[in-house]
Structure formats: structure tokens, C-alpha cells
Swiss-Prot record:
UniProt protein name: Large ribosomal subunit protein uL29
InterPro entries linked to this entry: Ribosomal_uL29, Ribosomal_uL29_sf
Species whose genome carries this gene: Solibacter usitatus (strain Ellin6076)
GO MF entries: structural constituent of ribosome
Keyword Ribosomal protein: yes
Keywords assigned by UniProt, alphabetized: Ribonucleoprotein, Ribosomal protein
Length: 67
């Protein structure tokens, strides 16, 4: 997910997507531990997307404090 697409979402949508990603990450890690999935690419991309969302949420939080 591109940063601009993430910035277009409101705070509630971002938090909802983060919860969904957490659940997906848990399932993917479980599948990897069971040997059902080999590729790390999807896990890495999800981790980067999650970090991007957290960063944008934090930016908004800090911008709100400055005002």
C-alpha cells in the first residue's frame, strides 16, 4: 500500500486496517511455523505496510499536539 493511499484514510479506517493486518500477520506466522508457507515476501511487505500506517498515525498525533 502506497503512503499516499494510507494518508487518504481517516484515523478510524487506519486503526481498523491495522487490526486486520495484525490478524493476518498472526495467521501467516502460524502458517510459516507449520511449514505450509515458504515465501517471506508477503510477510515483509505486510510488516512494511503496518509500519507505514503506524508512522502516519503518529504524524497525525504529533501534528494535533502542535496545534
Amino acid at each position: 500500500m502506497k503512503a499516499q493511499n494510507v494518508r487518504d484514510l481517516d484515523e478510524h479506517e487506519l486503526k481498523t486496517k491495522l487490526k486486520e493486518m495484525d490478524e493476518q500477520m498472526f495467521r501467516l506466522h502460524f502458517q510459516m511455523s507449520m511449514g505450509q508457507m515458504d515465501g517471506l515476501k508477503k510477510v515483509r511487505q505486510m510488516r512494511k505496510d503496518r509500519a507505514r500506517m503506524n508512522t502516519i498515525l503518529r504524524e497525525r498525533e504529533l501534528a494535533g499536539e502542535k496545534k
